[in-house]
Swiss-Prot record:
It comes from Escherichia coli (strain K12). Gene3D superfamilies: 3.40.50.1100. The gene is ygeX. Its EC number is 4.3.1.15. The modification N6-(pyridoxal phosphate)lysine is found at residue 77. This is Diaminopropionate ammonia-lyase. Catalyzes the alpha,beta-elimination reaction of both L- and D-alpha,beta-diaminopropionate (DAP) to form pyruvate and ammonia. In vitro the D-isomer of serine is degraded to pyruvate, though very poorly; other amino acids (L-serine, D- and L-threonine, D- and L-beta-Cl-alanine) are not substrates. In vivo allows poor growth on L-DAP or a DL-DAP mixture but not on D-DAP alone, this may be due to a poor promoter. DL-DAP is toxic in the absence of this enzyme, it may inhibit enzymes involved in the synthesis of pyruvate and aspartate, as well as amino acids derived from them. Disulfide bonds join 265-291. Keywords: Disulfide bond, Lyase, Pyridoxal phosphate. It is an enzyme of class 4 (lyase). InterPro entries: DiNH2opropionate_NH3_lyase, DiNH2propionate_NH3-lyase_sub, TrpB-like_PALP, TrpB-like_PALP_sf.
């Protein structure tokens, strides 16, 4: 077997207290999922058991939630955007989301509204999709360097798309300014002072994927010991972890938060025990994770309940893409993009590492470990996906 060393910096969470949040509970997840189930075309995304890979890596189970199958959008993000927009409209028109369907909501809206957001691709596509479904307008801002394919996917949903010359976090601030000037509703997946309601709804919407996964694992007769969650601002990681620890308890779930080393604001915050922002270009292939300022709502859950934080190089994500796209033994093939594959990439990088055994012990990975991984996206940038998987871009160096 080849041996090579990729950068995987692991920090234990010294500020863990196991305090869960009622905002991201099982009951809130059930409410969100009930809404999503009423959207035409809803079905749970697959939970794929990679049994042969698990055997190779020395664990009991590797379970990958494949979000490339979500509503034909190739990513999970619409779960948050659609749910938040629906909650916003229900509040505005005094409607009850528990009894309302997406179609009924569309018919109840008496005016044209414009929803604005900043995105690296998937969240904006989800907001654009929801706005289109409801007959509304969307204006989507993207940071510099955004892939044209991700821009086109948003334009194809009838939204306006503006690529700035700023990084993600500065683009968020620009979006806020323009929204205030034009009277648009901002649907952003990060929070700040005076802006928490919509990001809370978005995070609650993300929990649908976790509720599905728990149901699927119960049908398989397995209970997860580990979960790897990738983080940008930490909205998905916080919303999903909040739900999972409500189901299994923080003490019984070894949760690992993974980020690119060029945008590792959650990792640095985890080391300090308080929010740390990261600036600059944040140049990483993991475009969906290239965020330098943690969502305070997500950060609180991660600080309280995450077991460990990981900061890793881009080659870890690229390795994950290749392993998932070229399955071992009889395992199913999973098309996973840069931000989607980094969790599995960590497992693969540990397997090939010269200090494999000590890393396995550090992460409490052993023959009894049942590991849940979320592949949050498919090949949302096909050109770059092929450069990585076909052409060997960001290769490992033995």
């Amino acid at each position: 077997m080849s041996v090579f060393s990729l950068k995987i910096d692991i920090a234990d969470n010294k500020f863990f207290n196991g305090e869960t949040s009622p905002l991201f509970s099982q009951s809130q997840a059930k409410l969100a999922r009930q809404f999503h189930q009423k959207i035409a075309g809803y079905r749970p995304t697959p939970l794929c058991a990679l049994d042969d890979l698990a055997n190779l890596f020395g664990v009991k189970k590797i379970l990958v939630k494949d979000e490339s199958k979500r509503f034909g959008l190739n990513a999970f993000k619409m779960l948050g955007g659609a749910y938040a927009i629906a909650q916003l409209l229900c509040e505005k028109y005094h409607l009850d989301i528990e009894t309302l369907s997406f179609e009924h909501l569309k018919n109840a809206i008496g005016e044209k509204m414009t929803f604005a957001t900043t995105t690296d691709g998937n969240h904006g596509r989800g907001v654009a999709w929801a706005a289109q479904q409801l007959g509304q307008n969307a204006v989507i801002y993207m940071p510099k360097g955004s892939a044209q394919e991700r821009v086109d996917a948003i334009l194809n949903l009838g939204a306006e798309c503006i690529v700035t010359d700023m990084n993600y976090d500065d683009t968020v601030r620009l979006t806020m300014q323009h929204a205030q000037q034009h009277g648009w509703e901002v649907v952003q997946d990060t929070a700040w002072e005076g802006y928490t309601k919509i990001p809370t709804w978005i995070m609650q919407g993300y929990a649908t994927l976790a509720d599905e996964a728990v149901e699927q694992m119960r049908e398989m007769g397995v209970t997860p010991t580990h979960v790897l969650l990738q983080a940008g601002v930490g909205a998905m990681a916080g919303g999903v972890l909040g739900y999972l620890v409500d189901v299994y308890s923080p003490q019984n779930l070894h949760s690992i938060i993974v980020e690119p080393d060029k945008a590792d604001c959650i990792y640095r915050s985890g080391v300090k025990g308080d929010i740390v922002n990261v600036g600059g270009d944040m140049a990483t292939i993991m475009a969906g994770l290239a965020c330098g300022e943690p969502n305070p709502l997500g950060w609180e859950i991660l600080r309280n309940c995450a077991t460990q934080f990981i900061s890793c190089q881009d080659s870890v994500a690229a390795l994950g893409m290749r392993v998932l796209g070229n399955p071992y033994g009889n395992d199913p093939r999973i098309i996973s993009g840069e931000s989607g594959a980094v969790g599995l990439g960590v497992l693969a990088a540990v397997h090939y590492h010269p200090q494999r055994q000590s890393l396995m012990e550090k992460l409490a990975l052993n023959k009894d470990a049942v590991v849940l991984v979320i592949s949050t996206e498919g090949d949302t940038d096909v050109k770059h996906y092929r450069e990585v998987v076909w052409e060997g871009k960001h290769a490992v160096a033995p």
